[in-house]
Amino acid sequence: MVNLLAAYADRPEPRSVAVVGNQPLPSDPQRAKAIDACDLVIRVNGFVVDKPGEEVVGSRTHVVVFNRAIRATPYVFQDYRKRLYLLVEPGRMHWEPEDVPGWWPADLGAVPVSNREVVLPLSDALGLPTRDEPTWSTTGTLAAWIARTSFPTAQLVLTGFSFIDNPDQTSWEHAAGDSCIVGPEHQIAAEGRLLDSWTKTGDTTLLR
């Protein structure tokens, strides 16, 4: 997967990678510029990007990490032929069906993310018994894990991860304007601790 990600980045060996979660954020020109300045920008599920004149989360997207429950936004499949789409499917280990929604582009060419190589190692790092029980990380943390493990020497920029500051929430708002409960399969407090620990290493920056 590393070579595939690198093929979509601005340079073969990205020096900076941004992973943008879907927490609603206030306008911040410096944040938006920092995201768009990265060699590789990864967004998640039903994401949004800045419209002309906005300065919130930037406008560039190289990679989309998503799941079958993705919510439609105007940006999800915009310019999809120019992006890499990584389909995470941890639920396939338990109850999730193989079918994909009919509204996805027929020629999307999404690449499945390996449960064995990606999902389970992350679950181990989080202390989640995913092999035996239907519990796994959010798609956002999976995207961050993919970025960190694929490019361990790159500067990682994280933003839009509400559970780092609010690990006890039971529902959350999305930047696209919708909201939902935190799925019972997720343990967001553990995810928040993991991502927060990365910010102490000097090579990961959290932009609030």
Model-derived features: where do they sit?
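Metal-ion/cofactor- or nucleotide/acyl-coenzyme-handling active-site neighborhoods
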Residues: 1-208
